[in-house]
Amino acid sequence: MRGGFEGMLDDLDELRVPAGYKPEIIGGNIVLSPWPKGFYTRVMRRVCGQLEPYLPGGHLLDRTPHLFVFPGAERAFGPDIHAAHAQTYETDSVHLDGEGLSFVAELTSVSTRSGDLTDKVEVYGKAGVPVYLVLDMQQEQAIVFGSPSPRGYETRFTKPFGEKLYIPDPFGCTLDTTGFQAPQG
């Protein structure tokens, strides 16, 4: 491995990733996270369908895998759902500017839950990402973080799946989490 954050990004680009995993840089390490379970697609589609009408002007909402880079924090994340100004995506680089994000959502897995609820909360909040939504699939609850500041997020609201959760500005809408649970059986 080469030195520093830029070296880690280069190493990540050259990494041969096993099928079923995606690489991220978390806590100064290259971490392989599993691809989502099949039913996560249903949940992601419901989130996108509800938020799309409330997107800030000129922004795009997507589930395409992209690596958003936060050089100051030496982190690079590949969120499950992301929204950013269209200009953020207008690059030939695979490393997108994390500070261009207006919304991020992560659906936790057993292996990613801790980082989704700690490291990513801190990095997204300090970077100024207006809204970070964590769908805690293990605890069947939705957690939304808002009001980013240099200290991190100032607000946090939690609702169990099946209830409605307010998504703060720049969206200013309500997310219905009915049907976010895993299929039975």
Segments the model singles out, each with a brief description of its role:
Residues 1-185:
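Gly/Pro/Ser/Thr-rich low-complexity, intrinsically disordered segments predominantly at protein N-termini
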